[in-house]
Amino acid sequence: MVQTDQNTNSNSNDKDSQPGNLLSFLRPKNWKINLLAAKNPTWKLDKSMQKSHEIQLKAKFISRDLSWLKFDERVLDQARDTSKSLFDRLKFLAITASNLDEFFTIRMGSLYNYIDFGKERTDYSGLREVPFKQMLISSAQEFSQEKHRLFVDEILPLFPENGLLLASFADLTTLEQSEVETYFNRTIYPMLTPMVFDHTHTFPSLLAKTLIFGVVTIGGPERKVSKGKSERDRKISFVQIPLNLARFYVIEREDKIVFLPIEELIRQQLQVLYRNVEIESTTLFRITRNGDFDLVEHEDTETDFVDEIKKKIKDRRLGRVTRVEVEQEHSEFLLGEMLKRWSLEKSDIFVKTAILDFTSFWQILKHSEFKGQVAVNPPVVPPLGLKSIQIGDIFETMKRGDILLHHPYNNFEPVIQLLEQAADDPHVLAIKITLYRISKNSRIASALLRAAEQGKHVSVLFEVKARFDEENNIKEATKLQKAGCFVIYGIPGLKTHTKLLQVIRNEGTHVMSYAHLSSGNYNEDTAKLYTDLGLLTTDTRITQDIAEFFNVITGHSMPTHYEHLITAPRDMRNRLIDMIQTEMDNHKAGKAAGICWKINSLQDTLT
């Protein structure tokens, strides 16, 4: 992403007109004032931050990580919007939390891969790995603080007027307290396991993105630790809240709906897990782990690619800790032990003033109280090439001309219809498709299974390296393989992100090829939300290229060029640059010129 030159002498108060202000939210407020306070313990950090900011101002590019955080800031703006309903504002807060989880899992995880192993990298913004990490942590800390301030000061006060109560145990009536205690004893208590850490027990493997109680207990006789000072032995143990428990216990009163955070219920009953033991402190916290991994891939067919993926998925569960979120009232003794154990700095600790995990708001948003506020998709309109959204015979329809689909405004149904009709059509000889992310209970996968069971040749490139969908993709790919599909689990050294479908049909005098090309996944759920383009075509100039492409990914074909397809990593970069240059030349020559480009992100500096 290119940062344009700006007038550094501007006196405008508009934050977006200030020099480098595309990155202004990334530095702490009053950072210049702190810098002048030489006695301030943050002096070194502030000096480093100033130097980092100066480097960024000179850079021509903005890094993807800083851009990601800026995007989250815009999502938070939606939660700030007082014209929106409580439902919408709470939803956008939940989205920012999910996004930040992914940021610390992937982007910070990737950065730690360099820092921990002494590898060098320079970010697009011009910063090396350590100062860049400091910059990211600082910006994320400020963002997190503002997010919690917004919830406590502006959004939580809206709960009562909307008939809701986010309760503590003390807010419950005596009868309600008895009800939740019964629920704890019958359902929760049997699921909880205290995991102690001492000289006879190793440090437990704690799960990422789950709520955990760190419990410090004391016991035994006092022992002298220094002159005039003695203390009793301390032990640390951990109690993980099971992920399959609902995040809130819901009580429906006549006048309001009460949401009791499950951690408050457990905290109230925690002593029963430590009978005859004195609890010094309980601290609720949550960790994020590195989820970014690189595969050591080989062309050697002896290498079991799927087993390697499975191993990496297991490793991800125990990846390096990249962030600790902790409640405001916490044990410094426990925190110190965790910092040492996970090789973290104090700046990696995110102290929260409100409920620890905002992703839990999704449970509140799914409550029937909000049923009428769920966003309604706009009515679908006929795509270009069709007079109606109703399609009879998809093959006959495609023969009449190309169909351009713009999702979610155009229905995804024509694509599903092509596959489902192909699966059941006795004249269809073969189906070839690339899959990246599919929905749960996928109609796409069901159609492919049905086609294979009916004896059709079905080739599927199922990209098992689709991040966080690896497990599901392996499971679905195995089903297809068992049904008789020819399944490729990916190409060594590459991630196949293309979305292509080809149906080969015997039409008596000739064989016809029907194709679909898309920017979006073959996923009927996300097609209702994500903006993507797709093309249904029988144009032989395109279908011949697609046939060549499938020969490349399923076999050993190496065509010198395609007539109309542009592929990466072979020639996409050069072709795009050539096309951009052509438009520049046309403009200089006074000819009609312009570029319309739909992209997810732009990271290639040359482009």
PLM region spans:
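Ordered core of a single globular domain
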Residues: 599-601
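N-terminal localization/anchoring segments of enzymes in phospholipid and broader phosphate metabolism
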Residues: 2-5, 19-595, 604
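Asparagine/serine/threonine-enriched low-complexity, disordered tracts
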Residues: 9-15, 34
